[in-house]
Amino acid sequence: MSQNTKGAGLLISAIGVVYGDIGTSPLYALKETFAGHHPIAVTPDNVFGVLSLVFWTVMLLVTVKYVIVIMRADNHGEGGSLALLALVTELTRGYRVYYPLMLLGVIAAALFYGDSMITPAISVLSAVEGLEVVTPRLTPYVVPITAVVLTGLFMIQKRGTGLVGKLFGPVMCLWFLVLALLGIVNIVAAPHVLGAINPIYAADFIVKHPMMSFFALGSIVLAVTGGEALYTDMGHFGRFPIRVAWFALVLPALLLNYFGQGALLLSDPSAIQNPFFRQVPEWMVVPMVGLATCATVIASQAVISGAYSVARQAIQLGLLPRMTIVHTSGEEEGQIYIPFTNWTLYIAVMALVIGFQSSSNLAAAYGIAVTGTMMIDTILVAFVMALMWRWHWIAVAAVAGTLLLVDLAFFFANIIKVAQGGWFPLFIGVLSFTVLTTWRRGRELVRNQVKKLAVPLDVVMRALGPNVSRARGTAVFLTAATDGVPPALLHNLKHNQTVHQRVVLATVMTADTPYVPDSERVTMTDLGDGFHRLIIRYGFMQTPDVPAALELCKAFGQEFNMMATSFFLSRETYVPSLNPGMAHWRERLFTFMTLNATRATIFFKIPTDRVVELGTQLEI
């Protein structure tokens, strides 16, 4: 396959995965701005003002902020809030801002889940609502059809999306071409609408109608939802294909369609009830509903896949308990399925569809999570500018300060929508933040307790003496600590009075980078008397595999026969205590999460018939 063919394939794939969310925004962005909870009169001045705001919002928040600036801040090729967090915490380790920035990154991850629940619901609803343009008699069927489409989407997740995924790119390319064509047809009828590119119209609208424009920002932000996906999906496709796709197809198609809808409103203000489908010729509405539904399903799939990816990163970075991770492709490391995440999302999405009933009602809930995440991305990347790129502080203040002011304006414009539905992403954000921070703090308390009770290895080795029997074979003790003796070894010695001929104290660690190559996977140290310390490293985008890591120990002259190797694990039971460290209810939550975590044998891919689990009880 030639380099050009590969590049074209990557470009089309990027269009299918990266741009689904932002690509379906024309379905509802202008409609909600003019006819949402804070309606704006459809006058020529207002249309020009809103179009100008949409244009400059897309240019500033997506083109300048993400495409030009933030996409430079990759973590060894990976993007997204957690990848950026890992990069920034590495840069600021030892600084006072370390923990506040860590908390900000966790908040961004928590807000992401609120967003990932709303996107499938609002996208598919807005597409199916096109049937109402055909005839109002179809209105009662909008919610049931949406529910069926979304149920089908979530049910096929466990089978993987590799085969269907090959269609995503061509379908989205067709979608963007149709968006552009519809826009051009309407612009030709009123070409003067292109004058709204002039920022004077946006400024004039803000000055003349400060309150109205403030409310408008809360809906205009819908035009850039999904903009952060350009950065999040960078690891899958690379910076270059995403940028080329944006400038060559996606950006022109989006802007042409928004200006086309604006041109339609200038000639027919009544079209505001659904300007997207009203710009479509009558004979084409039903096929367009079909294409729009396909596009919104693709947008939803991208968000669902992103939720799996963020969950895996959170598990690897110690923010979530172990979960079952299923690889749905033998070729692509990134194609995974996490059952718990999938069904949690499904329940939340269905509750939103049934509870809110329409895309207009859901639009009020959309925006807070997106603008919050965008604001945190700006703050984190400011530290990358200063500490990694070595920009002068004036340049950092000018670029990051300007972007942060824009983010803040949109964030506060969305905060006022709390009572109308904005409470939902905030509720999910608080819930997710509580879970993430409780797990992280709980694991920290456990490590401290284990460290306190740990016995130094040299003490144990001296205590062994010549009388302790040595069993044949190898014993691998999995431990979170990189020093001292794991509780499982002490229990084995205490109760069985024996130690294996070869003892390996293995620790699986997660690096601040997305991937660790096999050449750097393992480090083995000979401690003497048959004892070895093994450090196994994985990136936060990788899934641990302990037996595969043991195979790499041949480089250190150590070979492992799985049939002669036993794996010893500590099965820890946590007892909430009155000791300072965590609130009692959080201790109970941590204990509950531990009980429901995926067993270490499954998560680390250890053969279950070679495992010995020894129970220990710890107070936290």
Swiss-Prot record:
For this protein, what reaction is catalysed?
K(+)(in) + H(+)(in) = K(+)(out) + H(+)(out)
Which UniProt keywords are listed? Cell inner membrane, Cell membrane, Ion transport, Membrane, Potassium, Potassium transport, Symport, Transmembrane, Transmembrane helix, Transport
Localization annotation: Cell inner membrane
Supply the source organism's classification: Bacteria, Pseudomonadati, Pseudomonadota, Alphaproteobacteria, Hyphomicrobiales
Encoding gene per record: kup1
Entry's Gene Ontology cellular component terms = plasma membrane
User: Which protein are we looking at?
Assistant: Probable potassium transport system protein Kup 1
Fetch the InterPro entries from UniProt.
K+_transporter, K_trans_C, K_trans_N, Kup
Please, which domain of life does this record's source organism belong to? Bacteria
